[in-house]
């Protein structure tokens, strides 16, 4: 006797479909010599429509993890985490294979970071955090990751000095150069570098909070008695603050 699948969340499917459609439009603008400005990534300062697509994917992943959590609790121990590790390793491997194909035949210049690698690492960390922590702990971890990321960007721990936030002269690119050497997208760093994992995991955890909220999983004892704080939590979960 088969168990009926839980109903799908239409809002999540709609956001996922819209994000995929937006990705296709951004990656295929029709004429690369004359691209509509919002469909181009910001060179450095500011943000464009194109810059929101990858975070949207990460947010959706967090929502999906929260919705899948009740079903995932049916398995415990290594089998539960084996699926997480397998999916993460598969994503990372796919990203490396694609990068190798682009670098072929000179594999000495292969790019190590990438979009799929970032998604794989983010999924691995977020899925384990969602599986092993409470909602309150996930809020704390998400906030702490943002604070750590901000601190690392402004801390004078490298040759550029404090608050060096120019292309090729900031902590994120300094870390990438130390970790990857020449195996990056550009000599000055990589947009899918190591420090960005912190903000990606934080975004996914905000997505998990949104998923829990949408599923109505918050019990009465965990809800704030302060209307203002409760509203702030809802806005953050919906991605307005986060």
Q: Where would I find each of the regions flagged by the language model?
A:
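Long hydrophobic alpha-helical segments that form multi-pass transmembrane helix bundles
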Residues: 135-206
